């Protein structure tokens, strides 16, 4: 029998847990494992990809593999908004592929009917809501299904517990509690009641095509819609003005924190001002000779950019040139080189023009603006 070829994106705690379960599944071959910042899009062809990367990457990674004829298993949440999840579901149907979101369907028959507790020390509150979407909201699907008439009530508690109630059509009322100051092992109300290996069992069913993919996606979409609703009421709404690289990054980061974000741009598309026309390089600070703090900020942000938008990077050692004019410059050639040395920036003097006192050659990171724009569109939608 032909082995099922699997690749995985994600080497974090859940990624390691997934790999330990995959090792136990028969008729399966793990072809590659990438970190979320590695070149996952350049790996060999597989039958299934396992996505266990940070939440804001799920949409673009799932979309890439569904567009390239690969089945997808994705860690919850599938996406951060229901509209993008619905798009992925339609894409999987169009390409006749299996798409599955990590779930806890195995707990369905042993879950409390109206009171849910989730206690975990640390972490982010938005992430807790996304987890509740699949551990708790997910499991009330059979009773509720229709969320058109839904109301939320935030209950103030004397302790640090966070409590809210969801009321569906005045028929079903569910109480949810989570606590960030819980210093004991993490606990949610359904886990103590099942002693089997739910994760391994789920992976086996999914990768061998024996799971109910349609039901999984219906429940996942339902849970994501409730999660959107809850986060909107708990964390509120915010606006980001300007869809350059800073505005887009801020908007996507705020979205992962639970905010309902509107991104405004005066142009007809994103990245049409400085982010889209400025030589396609990631500045390291060579053009800020009068501010060491700004140079340091540029150097630090360069590494953040490379990690967050790694798929757009073309060349880490692209040659660029900077000159000091002979006339009207506020910085002399000597002062310029002194500042670069203090900042730890590399340079090499090269032949210069007659109207320049100095020209240096440097190496900076060069990115593909078309790929960057595509990544940004996906992050905004995801």
Q: Can you name each region flagged by the protein language model?
A:
Residues 1-44, 232-233:
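N-terminal Rossmann-like dinucleotide-binding module
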Residues 18, 36-91:
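Beta-loop-alpha module in the N-terminal Rossmann-like domain of NAD(P)-dependent dehydrogenases
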Residues 48-53, 205-235:
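C-terminal helix-rich "cap/oligomerization" subdomain common to oxidoreductases
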Residues 79-126, 316:
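A contiguous active-site-proximal alpha/beta segment in oxidoreductase catalytic domains
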Residues 237-262:
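N-terminal Rossmann-like FAD-binding beta1-loop-alpha1 element of flavoenzymes
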Residues 256-277:
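Glycine-rich FAD pyrophosphate-binding loop
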Residues 279-358:
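Dinucleotide-binding Rossmann-like beta1-alpha1 core, especially the glycine-rich loop
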Residues 360-382:
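Helical element adjacent to the flavin cofactor pocket in flavoenzyme catalytic cores
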């Amino acid at each position: 029998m032909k082995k099922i070829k699997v690749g995985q994106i994600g080497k974090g705690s859940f990624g390691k847990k997934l790999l330990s379960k995959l090792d136990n599944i028969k008729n399966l071959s793990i072809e590659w494992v990438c970190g979320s910042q590695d070149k996952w899009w350049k790996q060999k062809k597989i039958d299934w990809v396992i996505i266990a990367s940070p939440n804001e990457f799920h949409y673009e990674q799932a979309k890439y593999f569904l567009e390239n004829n690969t089945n997808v298993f994705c860690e919850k949440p599938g996406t951060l908004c229901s509209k993008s999840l619905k798009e992925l579901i339609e894409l999987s149907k169009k390409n006749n592929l299996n798409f599955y979101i990590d779930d806890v369907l195995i707990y369905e028959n042993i879950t409390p009917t109206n009171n849910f507790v989730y206690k975990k020390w640390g972490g982010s509150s938005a992430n807790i809501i996304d987890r509740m979407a699949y551990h708790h909201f997910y499991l009330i699907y059979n009773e509720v299904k229709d969320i058109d008439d839904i109301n939320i009530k935030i209950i103030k508690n004397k302790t640090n517990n966070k409590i809210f109630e969801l009321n569906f059509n005045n028929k079903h009322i569910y109480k949810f509690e989570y606590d960030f100051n819980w210093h004991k092992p993490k606990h949610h109300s359904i886990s103590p009641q099942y002693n089997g290996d739910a994760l391994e069992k789920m992976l086996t069913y999914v990768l061998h095509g024996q799971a109910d993919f349609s039901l999984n996606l219906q429940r996942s979409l339902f849970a994501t819609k409730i999660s959107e609703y809850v986060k909107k009421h708990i964390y509120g709404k915010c606006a980001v003005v300007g869809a350059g690289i800073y505005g887009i990054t801020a908007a996507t980061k705020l979205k992962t924190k639970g905010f309902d974000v509107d991104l405004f741009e005066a142009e007809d598309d994103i990245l049409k001002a400085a982010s889209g026309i400025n030589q396609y390089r990631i500045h390291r600070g060579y053009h800020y000779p009068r501010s060491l703090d700004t140079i340091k900020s540029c150097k630090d942000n360069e590494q953040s950019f490379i990690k967050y938008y790694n798929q757009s990077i073309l060349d880490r050692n692209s040659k660029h040139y900077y000159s000091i004019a002979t006339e009207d410059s506020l910085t002399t050639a000597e002062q310029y080189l002194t500042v670069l040395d203090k900042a730890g920036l590399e340079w090499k003097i090269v032949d210069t023009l007659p109207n320049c006192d100095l020209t240096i050659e440097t190496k900076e990171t060069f990115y593909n603006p078309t790929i960057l724009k595509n990544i940004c569109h996906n992050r905004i939608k995801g």
